[in-house]
Amino acid sequence: MALELTKRQHNIQVNEINEPSEMIHLAEHVQPDLILCPFLTKRIPEEVYSNVRIPCWIVHPGIEGDRGASSIDWALYDREDEWGVTVLQAAEEMDAGDIWSTKNFQIRRRNINTLTKSSLYVNEVTQAAVEAVLEAIENLSEGTSPRPLDYSNPRVRGTLRSNMTKVDRSINWEMPADEIACQIRMSDSSPGAHACFRTSQGTEDNKWTKAFRVFGAHLEKGKLRFLPGKPGEILGQRHGSLLVKCGRGAVWVSHLKRDKLKLPANMWLLTGAPTIKDVSNLPIRYGSHPNTFQDVWTSMTPDGVCFVHFDFYNGAMSTNQCKRLISVLRQVEENDFCKVMVLMGGNDVFSNGIHLNVIEAAEDPAQESWNNINAINDVVRCIFTSKKITISALRGNAGAGGVMMALASDFAFAREAAVLNPHYKKMKLYGSEYHTYFLPKRVGQDKANELLSNAEPILACEAAEVGLLDGCLGDDAEEFESWVNHQASFLARSPLQMHFVRKKNRKVRKEVMETVETCRANELSMMAQNFQDPEYHQARKNFVYH
């Protein structure tokens, strides 16, 4: 939102408020024309909202009339088809102030597993919030007064809802799998659903499961949902996730959290939990969009365009995930029918780089950091040296590692709403992913230095303007994917495809590869020093346990 307002020449100052006194001081000291509170989590002090000279607005993630701190949670729980964002005047009574604007949106997902609270926030809610705030600012500029909340108006559908409690988020495994998955998604990524698992004898294993929060629900729609077991029993594991029996069907959970540390669910096997220590692995072949949990899959079009999806939780790529992705990329490379390879990343995040949570849990975090950065570098090398035409399609946001990985493709496109963070500075890292080669090659050395040193996010459209991306388009994921599909099909046509392949062969000749690998070696030399620096380890801890 701040980036969109800045793009429109508004002077924006962003502040994270921890105490009411901070907000009071800022309002008095800065004297802004407008105070904007997006998705508020703390009550606004009376000294601020009662100041008639400075309007104070709340951006509430709910339809007109909706009130309460669990708006999105209840919308997902109730399986609403339509929801919205409302900009309202801050007032003594929570979310009951006069209304400046409201924007509604449809809740539609082709893959129901992607419909989490955090996903709704970063996609539909954020887009509606930007539109609503811009309309509200226009109303303010034109002297249009806000309207009072009027529950007697039949068009006002929202109501005051209570805050969700731990009881609302506690899983009863006797329920059907789709209801349990909905319960997990409405709490993901914060605060998480609560669950106790059961042993094969049907007794609760409270000693092990008592403190766990559950994340990353995926409905099992294949034959595994018929595996025998008692509700709450863990039936199997795959790629970090655990399959749990429900009253009807089964659901995968990808992550569990305890003591503020969220990890791939199967990493808790190391605790020696009797419930799951002997759980069997449930392998799966790569192919079209799965009816089960699968974080890497491919699909091929009749004209030879292969879409490679790697939908890792929050975009973090562990060493093992990188190795699995490399395996798939090599399979695609060996497929002569494939002419164009499109890297799709995940629905909400293309990639955020190395997996800081897994690193934090490692016996030797410095060594795991080294393993992880080398593994993601190998992914980048696979992309750059591919003999296919390669496209990176950023449907969602991307952190430093993900941005730099995308630059290794022949073409990098993004959805208009995507936000990129092309820097490593806040994690006290020099960075790798061959960024010292690909970033200056695209934007020039001066701009590369600016992006890395500023440590600020950039909108996809701005990234395209400076040459970081080759283009951006699409208000939503469906429009963007359709456009990318068209571009890829165009490139796959025989004359064009042969032209680009010849061009690529020149690009990866021996002397160029020597330069590229020298960049990697220099980056890793700096990263090796970073991984021994206490500043990095503290920054990582702050991120993981925030």
Q: Residue ranges of each PLM-predicted region?
A:
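An anion-binding loop in the catalytic cleft
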Residues: 168-294
